[in-house]
UniProtKB/Swiss-Prot annotation:
Homodimer. Interacts with pgl-2 and pgl-3; this association is not required for P-granule localization of either pgl-2 or pgl-3. Interacts with ife-1. Interacts with prmt-1; the interaction is direct. Interacts with nmad-1. Interacts with P granule components meg-1, meg-3 and meg-4. Does not require metal ions for catalytic activity. Methylated at arginine residues in the RNA-binding RGG-box by prmt-1. Methylation promotes P-granule degradation by autophagy. Guanyl-specific endoribonuclease which cleaves the phosphodiester bond in single-stranded RNA between the 3'-guanylic residue and the 5'-OH residue of adjacent nucleotide, resulting in the formation of a corresponding 2',3'-cyclic phosphate intermediate. Together with the P-granule component pgl-3, is involved in the formation of P-granules. Together with pgl-3, probably recruits other granule components such as pos-1, mex-3 and glh-1 to P-granules. The dimerization domain also acts as a hinge; changes in its structure probably impact oligomerization and RNA-binding. The RNA-binding RGG-box is required for the recruitment of some P-granule components such as pos-1 and probably mRNA, but is dispensable for granule formation. It catalyses: [RNA] containing guanosine + H2O = an [RNA fragment]-3'-guanosine-3'-phosphate + a 5'-hydroxy-ribonucleotide-3'-[RNA fragment]. Signal peptide: none annotated. Transmembrane segments: none annotated. The active site is at 437 (proton acceptor). Disruption phenotype: Temperature-sensitive and are only fertile at 20 degrees Celsius. 25% of progeny arresting as late embryos and 9% as larvae at 26 degrees Celsius. Surviving progeny are sterile at 26 degrees Celsius, most likely due to germline proliferation defects. The temperature-sensitive period extends from mid-larvae to young adults. Germline defects include increased apoptosis in the gonad, fewer germ nuclei, no sperm and no oocytes in the gonad arms. Double knockout with pgl-3 results in 37% of progeny arresting as late embryos and 9% as larvae at 26 degrees Celsius. This is Guanyl-specific ribonuclease pgl-1. It is found in: Cytoplasmic granule. Residues 452-472, 568-595 have a biased composition (Polar residues).
Length: 730
């Protein structure tokens, strides 16, 4: 490993070895140190005289051994740890491991606990003339001395020999080596540092000579920073005087000012509750003149002030972690006031004012809620606000604490707050006379705690039923189909093939691993199309002709009626004048026009009917019904783009394959076996029979609207000359 070398770094005239990171920070942040000392690094502010507060150990370590330090900074920081004494020795050892990980070694790690080896190392350093040796020699002398004055003398050698005035000045302040005996010498070293700043950082020179830039202190704000018991009388009097002066005018400015002053009084009340000094709130009320009190506490609010204070203090202290006992609500009058609807409303209004006073800046400058508290002010305000919100919940849902709406309003409480409240109220209910109200509070909190657990959330889920999904389209599905109507045939088929959960247009993917099978129950014999074929635009399909199971007449009639209703709705949607339907939602929740147009999973394919179905009152226009990918009469209740002329089907009567929809096959005739859209008796979709017409076609002499499958006489014919339900021919 490479041994550490002690090298001096120059930052624009400011030389440093022990504190290179601090010197770099000071020279780069001179404006912040001068204009906003409170936001600057504590060690830097203390060294430059901008702050009188000495930095803590963590503040020092943050500067001498930063997390992202390189090997040179770590090695120098290890030397500083030795200078700062035994309490920093663990940091020295930890830094040694970190330095080793970087491929470097500190020369004092192996000898620091051996006085004999340290003495030998000091004698060798004394003989050398390098800066590295002089720094090491001074370092070893200082760590071997306990007396502060002697330490200071040895450190001054670094000033005279190496011009390390900045490092010596920093060590003097951190180690507390300034005394009456050393003050003159320290001033000289300080002047040397100031002169170094003269050429590179004049703001730092001004800071060290004149101190930090400061504004005149506001006497009222300073009074608010004093302990509450000592300052509350003066603060209330000051606010009351301003209030009375503003009351002489009735303009908007006066009303705004009086409102602000009123919230300042509420801020003081909340401060007394958060600080655990509830009796001070009584002193605040008594110190407010009658005229001011009538405006700040109108109507019933004066009557319920005590109840609002006791209730707020109780909840605030619980969420701030207090373990002390609380007065019975029956004894202090809280319970009685809560029983009255009008007094509950008055208490709620006061609690809302308490909340506003701490959430808004009532004073000209930010004022902490509890100035003497070591806790973070934002954390204190957050807990107090939650406590006041819970107190407000108690008033608004009095008597209905366990109802669903009330439980839902407790979402603002985190699990820790809920547990604190449950534990506190369980103890509280044991020592009071009337337990009904508090018991309801405990039960509601326990229900909320239970709902936060995985088992609780699971128990709230309603069991699903296995009811069959309605075959009719929903509004969202209709919207999705309309938005996908403009997509070309290839995109629609590919999207359908990619959806393994779709039903209606596509069969389940388990029936085919390499090729999706399209259910073609309205296309003629599957023996001619059992092999895969390219249907155009790079899409390959394989047709099958499943024989559907028969269903009972009642169920069949219901299914047909639902599909007809959905078909009417689809036609209305497709004929809308506006091309945009907003918003559309696909099955996976994305608002996109590229989603599959397959039917919902619960939708069933329509089986062949065995009963006669009554004609509808109004039949959709042929043009609208023909706008499907498979031709007219399609049972699939959705509009699809017009097909290309690549589709090939055959007639049931073993006619040759037609060249396209709307074209005659070479052998088709007036009694043909199912050509294209032409032919005297041919099916509109390459129908299945001859003279009798096709299953779904409109054409054919006397063909049924959903005509038969057979030849001249129909192999399964049921109907006569015409009729929508007829299966046979003439």
């Amino acid at each position: 490993m490479e041994a550490n070398k002690r090298e001096i770094v120059d930052f624009g005239g400011l030389r440093s070895y022990f504190f290179p990171n601090l010197a770099h920070y000071i020279t780069k942040n001179d404006e912040e140190l001068f204009n906003n000392t409170s936001q600057a690094n504590k060690l830097a502010a203390f060294v430059l005289g901008a702050s009188k507060d000495a930095p803590g150990d963590e503040d020092i370590l943050e500067m001498i051994l930063p997390n992202d330090a390189n090997a040179a900074v770590i090695a120098a920081g290890m030397d500083v740890c030795l200078l700062l004494g035994d309490k920093f020795r663990p940091k020295f050892d930890a830094a040694a491991e970190k330095l080793s990980g970087l491929g470097h070694a500190h020369d004092l790690v192996s000898v620091i606990d051996d006085d004999k080896k340290l003495g030998m190392l000091a004698r060798k350093a004394k003989l050398k003339k390098t800066e590295d040796a002089k720094i090491l020699q001074a370092l070893l002398k200082v760590i071997a001395i306990d007396d502060a004055a002697e330490k200071f003398v040895e450190l001054t050698e670094l000033v005279s020999q190496l011009d390390l005035d900045f490092d010596v000045y920093v060590l003097t302040k951190i180690l507390g080596l300034i005394s009456e005996e050393t003050s003159d010498e320290v001033d000289i070293i300080r002047d040397n540092v100031v002169n170094a700043f003269d050429s590179c950082k004049p703001l730092l020179k001004q800071l060290m000579l004149d101190g930090p830039k400061s504004e005149p202190a506001d006497p009222f704000i300073s009074l608010l920073m004093d302990p509450l018991e000592e300052s509350v009388g003066k603060v209330v009097n000051h606010i009351a005087q301003l209030f009375e002066e503003a009351s002489k005018n009735e303009g908007d400015e006066s009303l705004v000012l009086r409102s602000q002053l009123g919230y300042q009084l509420f801020f003081l009340i909340v401060r007394s509750l958060a600080d655990g000094k509830r009796e001070v709130s009584k002193k605040i009320l008594s110190g407010i003149p009658t005229s001011v009190r009538a405006e700040v506490f109108p109507g019933l609010q004066r009557s319920v002030y005590k109840s609002a204070v006791f209730l707020g203090n109780h909840i605030i202290q619980v969420l701030l972690g207090s373990k002390k006992s609380f007065e019975d609500w029956d004894v202090v009058g809280v319970a009685k006031d809560l029983e009255s609807a009008w007094k509950r409303r008055a208490i709620a209004e006061l609690i809302k004012k308490f909340q506003v006073s701490i959430l808004e800046q009532c004073f000209d400058k930010p004022v902490p809620l509890i100035p003497q508290s070591p806790l973070n002010n934002d954390a204190v305000i957050d807990n107090v606000n939650k406590a006041l919100q819970f107190a407000l919940w108690l008033t608004e849902f009095y008597g209905s604490e366990n109802e669903t709406e009330a439980l839902g309003e407790l979402r603002f409480l985190d699990s820790t707050s809920k547990n604190l409240l449950v534990d506190s109220f369980k103890k509280f209910v044991q020592g009071i006379n009337s337990k009904t109200h508090v018991t309801r509070i405990v039960e509601s909190l326990e229900k909320c705690c239970l709902s936060d657990t995985p088992s609780g959330r699971k128990s709230n889920v309603q069991p699903s039923t296995s009811q069959q999904q309605d075959s009719a389209y929903t509004k969202e599905e209709m919207t999705t189909v309309h938005n996908t109507y403009s997509v070309n045939t290839k995109a629609q088929v590919l999207n359908g093939l990619s959806d393994t959960n779709s039903s209606g247009l596509l069969v389940d993917s388990k029936d085919s691993l390499s090729l999706q099978e399209i259910s073609c129950d309205e296309v003629d014999s599957s023996t001619l199309l059992s092999s895969s074929r390219n249907i155009g635009e790079g899409v390959t399909v394989k047709a099958v002709d499943p024989v559907p199971e028969k269903v009972n007449d009642a169920q069949q009639q219901q299914t047909v009626n639902e599909i007809e209703m959905a078909s009417d709705a689809n036609q209305d949607t497709s004929s809308s004048a506006s091309p945009e339907v907003a918003p559309s939602f696909s099955t996976d929740g994305w608002d996109s026009p590229t989603k599959s147009v397959a039917l919902p999973p619960g939708m069933q394919q329509i089986d062949e009917e065995e009963t006669t179905v009554a004609d509808k009152d109004s039949t959709p226009q042929p043009q609208a019904r023909a706008e499907t990918a498979w031709g007219s009469g399609d049972a699939t209740p959705m509009p699809l783009p017009a097909p290309t002329n690549q589709y090939k089907v055959s007639g049931f009567g073993e006619a040759k394959v037609a060249k396209g929809f709307g074209q005659f096959a070479p052998t088709s005739s007036a009694y043909g076996g199912g050509g294209g859209r032409g032919g005297y008796g041919g099916g509109d979709r390459g129908g299945r029979g001859g003279y009798g017409g096709d299953r779904g076609g409109r054409g054919g002499y006397g063909g049924g609207d959903r005509g038969g499958r057979g030849g001249y006489g129909g192999d399964r014919g049921r109907g006569g000359y015409g009729g929508r339900g007829g299966r046979g021919g003439f």
